[in-house]
UniProtKB/Swiss-Prot annotation:
It is found in: Plastid, Chloroplast thylakoid membrane. Heterodimer of an alpha subunit and a beta subunit. PSII is composed of 1 copy each of membrane proteins PsbA, PsbB, PsbC, PsbD, PsbE, PsbF, PsbH, PsbI, PsbJ, PsbK, PsbL, PsbM, PsbT, PsbX, PsbY, PsbZ, Psb30/Ycf12, at least 3 peripheral proteins of the oxygen-evolving complex and a large number of cofactors. It forms dimeric complexes. This is Cytochrome b559 subunit beta. Its main location: plastid. It is a single-pass membrane protein. SUPFAM superfamilies: Cytochrome b559 subunits (SSF161045). The gene is psbF. Heme binds at residue 23.
């Protein structure tokens, strides 16, 4: 890593386009994986 003083002063916002795109894909994926695995244990 190079010693750059300018990079330390940058405050990154939390809600970025990358954050929205990751969570828009990840949150339904985790929800559907959890629901599918829960359905495997349902005895009919």
């Amino acid at each position: 890593m190079t010693t750059r003083k300018s990079a330390e002063a940058i405050t990154y916002p939390i809600f970025t386009v990358r954050w929205l795109s990751i969570h828009a894909l990840a949150v339904p994926t985790i929800f559907f994986l959890g629901s599918i695995t829960a359905m495997q244990f349902i005895q009919r």
